[in-house]
């Protein structure tokens, strides 16, 4: 399912317009990204948590040439699945 399909499905179930739903989803995603970018964690109980994690500097390797490279420390966004989400997926499996 892509974003437009999600918008259509939510609009169908809630009877709100697709335009309103798109604004809400776009705003929600922007807020999550901006919040995680500042170092804060965003938790949606039962669904999961978004946060940025520190990645230490390390030595890497160019897969094409085999040359060793230095990879500097960085922050990467992560998502941890909530219990309700995990259990729902496992039940339908």
From Swiss-Prot:
Keywords of this entry: Chloroplast, DNA condensation, DNA-binding, Plastid
Superkingdom, natural source: Eukaryota
Gene Ontology molecular function terms on file: DNA binding; structural constituent of chromatin
GO cellular component, one term: chloroplast
InterPro entries found in the cross-reference section: Hist_DNA-bd, Histone-like_DNA-bd_CS, IHF-like_DNA-bd_dom_sf
Gene3D superfamilies found in the cross-reference section: IHF-like DNA-binding proteins
BP GO annotations: chromosome condensation
One Pfam family of this chain: Bac_DNA_binding
Purpose: Histone-like DNA-binding protein which is capable of wrapping DNA to stabilize it, and thus to prevent its denaturation under extreme environmental conditions.
Family named by the database record: Belongs to the bacterial histone-like protein family.
Record protein name field: DNA-binding protein HU homolog
Organism from which the protein derives: Guillardia theta
